[in-house]
Amino acid sequence: MVKKILAGILCAATMITLSVGCSGGATPGASTDPSAKITGNTGEVKLEKGDKYAVMTIKDYGDITIKLYPDAAPKGTQNFIDLANSGFYNGKTFHRVVADFMAQGGKDFTGKTNVESFGIETNYNMRHFYGAFCYANALGNNSTEFYIVNNKKSQDYSSFSTSRIDNNIQGYEDYAKQYDKNSQEYTYYMFQANYYRNLKQFIENMDDATKAKYKEVGGTPSLDGNYTVFGQTVDGFDVLDKISAVEVETNDAMGGKEVSKPKTEIIIEKVVIKDYE
């Protein structure tokens, strides 16, 4: 089990981070305190009076209902609400689907989107459980793209050791030292070192309840600490599962190195933001 977890971590370190572009010039990095006390998705998740939630309608598939967490990710949540209310997501697609990992959408392939990017927002009580709603990012910057965790396989972190992660941190820092601090290579390797440092921090702060939930419902804990989790699916899991089971082919958006592009377009008809009463 530990070997499988490590393999997942090594893969995840590049799978989402390098998959998207972004506009603007925000400084990479977290913009919130991960230890801030909030009610996140680590406990029971249900809609309560006053909650903000999104209903995403996918053509020929149905609706996915997502509880939003503005307390955990104020910038990210408001950005998504503004985009949804403006109709930005209408007609966009799920352009990338990886079974037992995530389904990603919201990319503007025209390159005409003028959305200011912003840093990630993380919290120990917001985790990548099955159905988590998150921002894809490029070197620490969020913009318009999101993903929904579709991995239902049990994740057992009860005896996980972070020693291998320490080795990865040191390795990337050693690589970075070979380059000028103003170079792209230095920036890339230090980003990777910080990626693993953030991941280690989140694993070390994974309490027993969080470990138990990962074991029960599944998810991708190897992404914790490096992506903004700002929502949690509460209804429409069957729709998510259908999307996750589609036939895929080589994805040019991933440099042609990944088989993840749905053979038939998965179109988002609309995203409606509501207040639960």
What would you call each of these model-derived segments?
Residues 2, 22-277:
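Cyclophilin-like peptidyl-prolyl cis-trans isomerases
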Residues 12-13:
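Repetitive helical segments and hydrophobic/amphipathic motifs
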Residues 1-8:
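Positively charged n-region of N-terminal signal peptides that target proteins for export
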Residues 17-21:
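C-terminal motif of bacterial Sec signal peptides marking the signal peptidase cleavage site
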